[in-house]
UniProtKB/Swiss-Prot annotation:
The keyword Transmembrane applies. It is a single-pass membrane protein. It comes from the Viruses. GO terms for cellular component: host cell membrane; membrane; virion component. This is Uncharacterized protein R695. It is found in: Virion; Host membrane. Keywords: Host membrane, Membrane, Transmembrane, Transmembrane helix, Virion. Its main location: virion. The chain crosses the membrane at residues 71-91.
Length: 147
């Protein structure tokens, strides 16, 4: 009975086929996760921007509803826009979390392949605040922007 040595494994046609399939799977996963990472980051940025616009609009409408007392619908619209702002802000947080998750998935594959990892460009506001207060040091793979 023959034993499999490392030289036999390298020349084995099944091993080469399997290696090719695994490499293709890694490539597909990297491509998908990099695209998803960018897409979720964009969605998060847009959602957060829209949320801030809604907060401003809601504030103006709330003020206007007190000034124009005969237009009852203004208070309702102000409240509705304010709630919409909260929904958009929560969705933005979800999208940023998804972007970070995709970055982690990409980094797992890159590490497995022996390649350099990419930094996570999403930093939660609580982390920024803690760093500014000196509570946390720099973390691996974080992009720190001095303010």
């Amino acid at each position: 009975m023959a034993t499999n040595t490392s030289s036999n494994l390298l020349t084995n046609p099944y091993t080469e086929r399997e290696k090719k399939l695994i490499d293709e799977a890694y490539y597909r996963d990297l491509k998908y996760n990099l695209t998803s990472k960018s897409r979720w980051k964009f969605i998060g940025d847009v959602s957060e921007t829209l949320s801030q616009i809604c907060v401003g609009t809601s504030s103006v409408l709330a003020f206007a509803s007190g000034f124009f007392e005969d237009i009852d619908i203004l208070a309702f619209v102000a409240g509705t826009v304010g709630v919409g702002s909260l929904v958009l802000l929560q969705f933005s947080s979800y999208a940023m979390k998804e972007s970070s998750e995709r970055t982690q998935q990409v980094n797992v594959i890159l590490t497995k392949l022996g390649l350099e990892t990419i930094p996570d460009i999403v930093v939660e506001p609580s982390i920024i605040k803690a760093r500014l207060q000196g509570e946390l040091g720099e973390q691996e793979n974080d992009v720190v922007i001095e303010v």
